[in-house]
Amino acid sequence: MTVANRRIAVYPGTFDPITNGHIDLVSRAAPLFEKVVVGVAQSPSKGPALPLEQRVQLARGALGHHSNVEVIGFDTLLAHFVRSVQGGVLLRGLRAVSDFEYEFQMASMNRHLIPEVETLFLTPAEQHSFISSSLVREIARLGGDVSGFVPAAVLEALRKVREAKSAQS
């Protein structure tokens, strides 16, 4: 078994798309750890709007200014991924009290699967507390302005998805 390293944090998510809220959380976590691994999950059951490789590239573009942040796509059980990168801390964001019940359940399950790893919850900066990838996708799909919620490269990717869907209709 791989030994967990408490100086390596893993921040998993679908990141469909990565938002300014995600970026803020990573930016605040990066100084706390030797390394932060952003694990971009395949998550086929969620039916992502953007393919895994594009989500990985967008996250790398948004987070590339952090020398201790690595973005990796994965399609395995989270516990296996965390062990493969020798993570010792699992980072999770809590935007609102409504997130807590789900995140508490996930933390409890992860404690059973990877007992050597601790889950650490971070709250977002106030200006990002209402941002979610699903809301961003829905607003973008309906032609709304999401420029205040995502980096420019993500905005462009969402525009292309919308145009492609419009062309199919």
Curated annotation (Swiss-Prot):
<comment type="subunit">
    <text>Homohexamer.</text>
</comment>
<protein>
    <recommendedName>
        <fullName>Phosphopantetheine adenylyltransferase</fullName>
        <ecNumber>2.7.7.3</ecNumber>
    </recommendedName>
</protein>
<dbReference type="InterPro" id="IPR014729">
    <property type="entry name" value="Rossmann-like_a/b/a_fold"/>
</dbReference>
<dbReference type="InterPro" id="IPR001980">
    <property type="entry name" value="PPAT"/>
</dbReference>
<feature type="binding site">
    <location>
        <position position="103"/>
    </location>
    <ligand>
        <name>ATP</name>
    </ligand>
</feature>
<comment type="function">
    <text>Reversibly transfers an adenylyl group from ATP to 4'-phosphopantetheine, yielding dephospho-CoA (dPCoA) and pyrophosphate.</text>
</comment>
<feature type="binding site">
    <location>
        <position position="78"/>
    </location>
    <ligand>
        <name>substrate</name>
    </ligand>
</feature>
<feature type="binding site">
    <location>
        <position position="92"/>
    </location>
    <ligand>
        <name>substrate</name>
    </ligand>
</feature>
<feature type="site" description="Transition state stabilizer">
    <location>
        <position position="22"/>
    </location>
</feature>
<keyword id="KW-0460">Magnesium</keyword>
<feature type="binding site">
    <location>
        <position position="22"/>
    </location>
    <ligand>
        <name>ATP</name>
    </ligand>
</feature>
<keyword id="KW-0808">Transferase</keyword>
<dbReference type="GO" id="GO:0004595">
    <property type="term" value="F:pantetheine-phosphate adenylyltransferase activity"/>
</dbReference>
<dbReference type="InterPro" id="IPR004821">
    <property type="entry name" value="Cyt_trans-like"/>
</dbReference>
<feature type="binding site">
    <location>
        <position position="46"/>
    </location>
    <ligand>
        <name>substrate</name>
    </ligand>
</feature>
<feature type="binding site">
    <location>
        <begin position="128"/>
        <end position="134"/>
    </location>
    <ligand>
        <name>ATP</name>
    </ligand>
</feature>
<dbReference type="Pfam" id="PF01467">
    <property type="entry name" value="CTP_transf_like"/>
</dbReference>
<dbReference type="GO" id="GO:0005524">
    <property type="term" value="F:ATP binding"/>
</dbReference>
<feature type="binding site">
    <location>
        <begin position="93"/>
        <end position="95"/>
    </location>
    <ligand>
        <name>ATP</name>
    </ligand>
</feature>
<keyword id="KW-0173">Coenzyme A biosynthesis</keyword>
<keyword id="KW-0548">Nucleotidyltransferase</keyword>
<keyword id="KW-0547">Nucleotide-binding</keyword>
<keyword id="KW-0963">Cytoplasm</keyword>
<keyword id="KW-0067">ATP-binding</keyword>
<feature type="binding site">
    <location>
        <begin position="14"/>
        <end position="15"/>
    </location>
    <ligand>
        <name>ATP</name>
    </ligand>
</feature>
<dbReference type="GO" id="GO:0005737">
    <property type="term" value="C:cytoplasm"/>
</dbReference>
<feature type="binding site">
    <location>
        <position position="14"/>
    </location>
    <ligand>
        <name>substrate</name>
    </ligand>
</feature>
<comment type="pathway">
    <text>Cofactor biosynthesis; coenzyme A biosynthesis; CoA from (R)-pantothenate: step 4/5.</text>
</comment>
<comment type="similarity">
    <text>Belongs to the bacterial CoaD family.</text>
</comment>
<dbReference type="GO" id="GO:0015937">
    <property type="term" value="P:coenzyme A biosynthetic process"/>
</dbReference>
